[in-house]
Amino acid sequence: MTVPQPAQPPQSARPAGRKTGALPPEDRERSPYTGWTRAHWEATADGLLQAVVPYASPRNGLINLPGARPSWAGPRSDGLEGYARTFLAAAFRVAGSGGRDPHGYLARYGEGLAAGTEHPVTEPGLDGKDPDAWPVIPDTRQAIVESASVALGLRLTRPWLWDTLDDKVRTRAVDWLLPALDPPPIDNNWWLFGLTVGGFLLDAGVETERAQASVDRALERIDGWYRGEGWYSDGDNQAFDHYNGWALHFYPVLHAHLSGDRALLDTYGERLRAHLDGYRRMFDANGAPMPFGRSLTYRFATLAAPWLGALTGHTPLSPGATRRLASGTLRHFVDHGAVTDEGLLPLGWYGPYAPMLQGYSGPASPYWASKGLLGLLLPDGHPAWTEREEPLPAETEDAVTTLRAPGLLVQATASDGLVRLHNHGSSSVFGPADPNYARFAYSTRTGPSAAEEAVAIVDTAANPGSDTTPVATPDNHFALLVDGASTGRGPVEPLGSGPGWAASAHTPRRADGSELAGVRVRSATLAHGRAEVRVHLVTGAAPGTPVRQTGWAVPDDGPTAQLHAVHGFTQDGGQPRTVPTGSTPFGEHTRTACLDGTVPDAPEAALFVSIASLTAEADPAPARTLAEVRLSGSHAIHVTWKDGTTSTLTLTADTATAP
């Protein structure tokens, strides 16, 4: 059979990296798409775990990984992060092997547990203090996060580690963990760290009443964020991203499974199943997950949810489809420079990429990717390891999938295996200018462009009197130009969605974050094949206000991006111009097509329509040939696609409706 081969990212985005040590031969009979088996996963995990050994403190309490920047929690917390996150990988490795531990991982992490909890400290730095001591949880908030990995690792390896420890060590460890049971300082997925600590303490028979209360509080809190179709909002907001898989499903479903609580598993496991039904469509045929949302340096933590579905049986994926997805993604990162020559995971996507990071990102943050190794809990004979790989959705059909609960539209094409995501429902927890959420579209092979280069910049073409040099234009963005500066997309307000379309509204914001009073933008995306019809209805803007639509940010050796004016973009005769979009995880220098227009004098509402396309096909037909768009009445958009099928959508001040 013919098997798609992993696509290569641009050379500039693919630093030389090793494949985490010696890998076994490929098995193209069992794994025709990736060649990988469980042995490849074991070798990858072992390579990652052995590579961090030189950076351990004298008694293994901290793992102080190299890096140009510490997190805002400080170097001691970063060292705890190195211990906790790699311990989780070791726990998956040993527990899934029935306790076999030829590399001595548990002895090392057991020594670190004893040393780290012996004399916990409050100071964030490492100078002049016990080099192995852990930070105290009430004083170091990040330690709450890491307590979950410590507790889960201990729970998974309890017969081989916890049950063998000295009573004094266990008492100290419990004392260190207990504060994590309290309500968290951040009202989002952080509630689940207490749940995870509580689950371990319940298993260990320690402080069971307090532990159960923490579990119950956490489940009650996240239930209020469940929006249906397998999607949680990460707090009282509209934040939908990969935290659904690697936190909001990961912790409660794994807790229910380890507890043997069928009632809990029936509830949370079925939510996981629903989530995976759409989530599986977000993976490129080359293995890449969707670079959308925060904490993308966690990379293959995106595999936590698919593996969890296989572990618990709550999944729409067959065993062979699960392994093909998971092995495709892990191999994609290993093959594309996500592991350094020293065997470490740097801060970035493929290689190092600083613009992707958050303030809480430190040298050990990427090891949250350990969650993606959850599949190692499945024994050798599990069908997920033994059945023949099956293709991904992106390899079998062109499809546009509407995820109504999060307001996302997932568009995939089988000819190139490329996946695009159109965002009409998710907003950043950090503010409207965050490019990881604020763009209208994302894909598995592009952007977004870097925040410091692309948000609300001054454009000298629109403001000739300015002496500021333009740097880069935000990709996949629709903006008004106010005093020459592009407005940002305010918090996203979903207007509706249906087969092949999704719509939202926002209030544009200036560079300082202030809103444009009285101005609203209603936006919609209609998708079919590789074609996207992008629609924006502007109300409340002064006549003559410039507007701008941008397309996909691509490097010279990337996929082909196209943008075609349909209505409202009158500058330059409606012809797109090419502008720089700065760096992305896929290339240091990218560019995008750009359309310009102005708000007309007469109508109360101004409509702007374009056709966009992103494709890896060779010599693609122009975007204008992909759809015929006709406007009628009160902002009704009628689309006849290239294959003759049709779509209709009407935008109003408050709604988006389709027949």
Predicted regions and their residues:
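Solvent-exposed loop and beta-edge segments used for protein-protein assembly and interaction
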Residues: 80, 144-146, 403, 526-530, ...
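Extreme N-terminal leader/anchor segments
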Residues: 1-127
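Short, solvent-exposed secondary-structure capping/transition elements
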Residues: 95-99, 162-163, 381-382, 544-547
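Beta-strand-rich N-terminal accessory domains
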Residues: 388-452, 634-637, 643-657
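Extended repeat-based interaction scaffolds and adjacent low-complexity, acidic/S/T/P-biased segments
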Residues: 445, 451-659
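Residue-level detector of short, conserved catalytic/binding motifs and their immediate flanks
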Residues: 84, 148, 409, 534
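Aromatic-lined, polymer-binding surfaces characteristic
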Residues: 79-80, 88-94, 102, 106-307
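Carbohydrate-active enzyme catalytic cores, enriched for enzymes
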Residues: 120-135, 284-428
